[in-house]
Swiss-Prot record:
Biological role: Positive regulator essential for the expression of allD operon. Binds to the allD promoter.
Organism: Klebsiella pneumoniae
HTH lysR-type domain mapped to chain residues: 4-61
PROSITE patterns named among the record's database cross-references: HTH_LYSR
Record-stated family: Belongs to the LysR transcriptional regulatory family.
Protein name listed in UniProt: HTH-type transcriptional activator AllS
Keywords, alphabetical: Activator, DNA-binding, Transcription, Transcription regulation
PANTHER family, alphabetized: HTH-TYPE TRANSCRIPTIONAL ACTIVATOR ALLS, TRANSCRIPTIONAL REGULATOR
InterPro entries to which the protein is assigned, alphabetical: LTTR, LysR_subst-bd, Tscrpt_reg_HTH_LysR, WH-like_DNA-bd_sf, WH_DNA-bd_sf
Gene3D superfamilies xrefs: 3.40.190.290, Winged helix-like DNA-binding domain superfamily/Winged helix DNA-binding domain
Family annotation (Pfam families): HTH_1 (PF00126), LysR_substrate (PF03466)
Length: 270
């Protein structure tokens, strides 16, 4: 409709934001008479008063406040549309969903990645999900995600996907220096280990077979939801188990954890 053309809406928003016809005129490089005429025409066409005028100020009416919110949204959409259309023409997706392995999820790293992505692709919406073990594959295969960081294994689980190596995770068997096993002489036997619970993270897969974490036959297991809780449980001495080397080396250096030479029969890989 002509009464809601972009030029009229920008005039209305300027008057609302400055609270003055004359200041809006200066901002838009128009005469005060032009601004006043546009607002009067807009009010006549809508059939409602958008401003309450006094000798000192111009205030929005309830209808004016509603139009202001809508006008800002419309103008934002109009201003961004050329860039959005160009991005679509270049083959850039409007929505990109990325799933990240719990072991590799770092809030600061994700924030830096988002800063780069949003600058490079300003009109794309990004959705990040944090999953555990086979939950990464599960999300990638079944939940409309197009990229995964840190999938398990070296082969894709679908023909239309490609896997690129990031490296292997080295695991260390650790415990609190206050844990009873810390006083035992290396190497620890399975019989000694079985007396204390293993702390493991629950696999978040819902449709794929869950990964079996390290636990000896007959050993009690404590299951936690994420790597942060697993680390905290080790620090508190409530259980034993494996942690990624880069994560636990600083804690070992600080004397908060100790590493044992125990190695499982089947090497841990991730």
């Amino acid at each position: 409709m002509a009464m809601l053309d972009p030029e009229t809406l920008r005039t209305f928003v300027s008057v609302a934001e400055t609270g003055s016809f004359s200041r809006a005129a200066e901002k838009l490089y128009k005469t005060t008479a032009t601004i006043s005429y546009r607002i009067k025409l807009l009010e006549d066409n809508t059939g409602v008063a958008l401003f309450s005028r006094t000798t000192r100020s111009v205030l929005l009416t309830p209808a004016g406040m509603h139009l202001l919110a809508q006008a800002r949204e419309w103008l934002g959409w109009i201003d961004s549309m050329p860039g959005e259309l160009q991005q679509i023409n270049d083959g850039v997706e409007r929505q990109v969903n990325i799933v990240v392995n719990n072991l590799m999820y770092d809030p600061q790293a994700i924030a830096r990645l988002l800063a780069w992505l949003t600058q490079r692709y300003p009109f794309t919406q990004f959705h990040f999900s944090r999953q555990i073990y086979m939950g990464v594959w599960d999300t990638l295969l079944h939940d409309d995600f197009s990229l995964a960081i840190g999938v398990t294994g070296t082969e894709p689980l679908a023909e239309n996907m490609a896997v690129y190596p990031l490296g292997e995770v080295t695991w260390l068997f650790v415990m609190s220096p206050h844990h009873p096993l810390s006083q035992q002489t290396d190497p620890l036997s399975e019989a000694q280990l079985r007396r204390y619970p293993a702390v493991n993270i629950e696999d978040s897969a819902r449709r794929l077979t869950k990964r079996v974490a390290w636990r000896l036959p007959g050993q009690k297991e404590i299951v936690v939801p994420d790597i942060e809780t697993k680390v905290a449980a080790h620090l508190a001495g409530v259980g034993i188990g494996f942690l990624p080397e880069p994560l636990c080396l600083p804690l070992i250096a600080q004397g908060k954890l100790i590493a044992d030479t125990f190695r499982p029969c089947v090497p841990l890989r991730h």
